[in-house]
């Protein structure tokens, strides 16, 4: 047993040292990738806290706040139109208990006059525009705006239509594939491999496991975006479980596992942008950026823009005029 320890302990120690060394210096093993478009402000569902979600009015409002990224979910109508809609069933959004794929585009109902904001329970969004929009309409109006498109189910027709629309509008590099399931992402990637992709849920767990095993520096990462919920919003604005104690437990565990500056910094050094979602309060903005996140996804683009502008003003050096005034006062 003792001779075995003489071999195991030095080997383990060397492995730990190498892992830490390359975790901090991944450029020695991997070619650095510069982000095509930096993201600070991402608008969730087009900015669903200030206008009705996924409407053109919401998108225009977000763009007025200089949003860097628009996030949408895609569904397919009966007549083959890709529409921007979070839900497949329309009952929550419109009161009509029908699926999007059972209606033609022209038959889609109006949104309700107010919709509860999922990540701000008890708060409701309103707007004068209640029309559902097609992805093509958004591409036409904002041809050079980066967008993240989530496909929720393995629908080959939907995936290929999204891929072809992206090609037709020559926006492969600024349109992100997103999916919860790896099986769906595999098909998205096959339909248009030129589009960058975000981590799926399984891939996110896998990356975390590799990080804690010390293997992450030695593994390739094809994804360019890591969209992750901020653990501090669990049991406050985000309730993944019905039981309160489960939410509290998950908040504690995920806070310990995910909120690691060294992990975020390593991913960024590998060319992966890290964004936390879906944050709607200034205190959460502060936590996310203090961890080193590239950006934040929010329902309230105006609130996040005010926060970012305020932070920029505080970090800017004093202007010459201000310095001269101070010297005169002295």
From Swiss-Prot:
Disordered: annotated segments: 311-330
Regions crossing the membrane: 2-22, 201-221
GO molecular function, one term: lysophospholipase activity
A Pfam family recorded for this sequence: GDPD
Topological domains annotated Extracellular: 23-200
Compartment(s) of residence: Membrane; Cytoplasm, Perinuclear region; Endoplasmic reticulum membrane
SUPFAM superfamilies with a match to the protein in the record: PLC-like phosphodiesterases (SSF51695)
Control of this protein's activity: Lysophospholipase D activity is stimulated by calcium. Loss of lysophospholipase D activity in presence of EDTA.
Record-linked InterPro entries: GDPD-Related, GP_PDE_dom, PLC-like_Pdiesterase_TIM-brl
Keyword terms: Cytoplasm, Endoplasmic reticulum, Hydrolase, Lipid metabolism, Membrane, Metal-binding, Transmembrane, Transmembrane helix
Tissue: Highly expressed in stomach and kidney. In stomach detected in the glandular epithelium. Predominantly expressed in the stomach (at protein level).
Cell inner membrane among keywords: no
Reaction(s) this enzyme catalyzes, per UniProt: 1-hexadecanoyl-sn-glycero-3-phosphocholine + H2O = 1-hexadecanoyl-sn-glycero-3-phosphate + choline + H(+); 1-O-hexadecyl-sn-glycero-3-phosphocholine + H2O = 1-O-hexadecyl-sn-glycero-3-phosphate + choline + H(+); 1-O-(1Z-octadecenyl)-sn-glycero-3-phospho-N-hexadecanoyl-ethanolamine + H2O = 1-O-(1Z-octadecenyl)-sn-glycero-3-phosphate + N-hexadecanoylethanolamine + H(+); N-(5Z,8Z,11Z,14Z-eicosatetraenoyl)-1-(9Z-octadecenoyl)-sn-glycero-3-phosphoethanolamine + H2O = N-(5Z,8Z,11Z,14Z-eicosatetraenoyl)-ethanolamine + 1-(9Z-octadecenoyl)-sn-glycero-3-phosphate + H(+)
Keyword Membrane: yes
Chain ranges of the GP-PDE domain: 39-308
Cytoplasmic side: 1, 222-330
Topology of the protein relative to the lipid bilayer: Multi-pass membrane protein
Top-level EC class as recorded in UniProt: hydrolase
Function: Hydrolyzes lysoglycerophospholipids to produce lysophosphatidic acid (LPA) and the corresponding amines. Shows a preference for 1-O-alkyl-sn-glycero-3-phosphocholine (lyso-PAF), lysophosphatidylcholine (lyso-PC) and N-acylethanolamine lysophospholipids. Does not display glycerophosphodiester phosphodiesterase activity, since it cannot hydrolyze either glycerophosphoinositol or glycerophosphocholine.
Family: Belongs to the glycerophosphoryl diester phosphodiesterase family.
Protein name in the entry: Lysophospholipase D GDPD3
The organism of origin for this protein: Mus musculus
Name of the encoding gene: Gdpd3
């Amino acid at each position: 047993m003792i001779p075995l320890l003489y071999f195991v302990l030095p080997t383990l120690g060397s492995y730990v040292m190498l892992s830490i060394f390359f975790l901090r210096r991944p450029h020695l093993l991997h070619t650095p990738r510069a982000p095509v478009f930096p993201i600070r402000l991402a608008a969730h569902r087009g900015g669903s806290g200030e206008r009705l979600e996924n409407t053109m009015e919401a998108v225009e409002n977000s763009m007025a706040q200089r949003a860097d990224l628009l996030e949408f979910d895609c569904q397919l109508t009966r007549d083959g139109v890709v529409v921007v809609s979070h839900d497949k069933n329309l009952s929550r959004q419109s009161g009509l208990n029908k699926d999007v794929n059972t209606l033609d585009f022209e038959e889609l109902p109006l949104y309700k006059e107010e919709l509860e904001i999922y990540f701000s329970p008890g708060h409701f969004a309103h707007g004068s525009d209640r029309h559902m929009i097609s992805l093509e309409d958004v591409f036409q109006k904002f041809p050079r705006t980066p967008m993240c498109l989530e496909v929720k189910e393995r629908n080959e027709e939907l995936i290929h239509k999204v891929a072809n629309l992206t090609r037709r509008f020559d926006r492969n590099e600024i349109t992100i594939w997103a999916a919860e399931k790896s099986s769906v992402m595999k098909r998205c990637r096959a339909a248009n491999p030129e589009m960058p992709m975000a981590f799926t849920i399984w891939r996110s767990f896998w990356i975390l496991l590799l990080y804690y095993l010390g293997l992450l520096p030695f593994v390739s990462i094809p994804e360019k975006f890591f969209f992750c919920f901020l653990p501090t919003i669990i049991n406050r604005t985000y309730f993944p479980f019905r039981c309160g104690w489960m939410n509290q437990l998950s908040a504690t565990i995920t806070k310990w596992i995910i909120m690691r500056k060294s992990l975020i910094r390593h991913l960024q050094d590998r060319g992966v942008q890290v964004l936390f979602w879906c944050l709607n309060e200034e205190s959460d903005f502060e936590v996310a950026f203090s961890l080193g996140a590239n950006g934040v996804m929010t329902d309230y683009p105006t609130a996040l823009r005010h926060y970012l502008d305020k932070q920029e003003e505080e970090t800017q050096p004093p202007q010459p005029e201000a310095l001269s005034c101070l010297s005169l006062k002295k």
